[in-house]
Amino acid sequence: RADYEAGAMSAEELKKTEDKAITELVAKQKEAGYHVITDGEFRRATWHLDFMWAFDGVGHSKTETGLPFHGEAAMIDDTYVTGKISYKKNHSFVEHFKFVKTLEDENTVAKLTIPAPAQFLEQMIMPFAWSNTKKFYDTQEEVAKDIAEGYREFIKEVYAAGCRNLQLDDCSWGMVVDPAACKLFGVTPKGLEKIKEQLLEINNSALEGKPEDLIVNTHVCRGNFHSTYA
């Protein structure tokens, strides 16, 4: 990917390299006895932000300061609102999933991992982001409404592509129970309770109307960048 970003590799060459690496990875998963297979997120720059970048109304640029993790700044792209957030059809993650789907067999099911709606919302309402987000939204509830609608559209599209196992990766819960949570979010204890409710509500709203045979699970952690955490 570094070669691609430096202009030393074409998009076609990058995809061939990714396809080969993912095929080898899935073979190892099967050898280990896994019944659920994934692409290891090999096509992404980060585990979560690439998903957001594919939405209308979301932009990103090379960071100068990074995000403060414990002991180190995570030097990942700044990601921010550029307009009203909405789902853009033909999301790249749907294509990513389709490739893994071709590697299924009678013993395995392809799973797609994406950031949870709460994670998306948190990215846009934390103090470092809200001053920009409020140029386009009057309230955080309006942001949540648009994000949830976008997720519902994405779920329809990836389900139509054959996805029956979707994982929501969510670092937001570890942050809201941190002893320093009020400082992190720039709120009072009462304000923090409101944020917790918002995170719960957006996750539930995004899943409204999902197909009954779509399995949705979640993974909760504090993030990972060079083995440090948010």
Predicted ranges, named:
Residues 1-230:
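Domain-level signal for soluble alpha/beta catalytic cores
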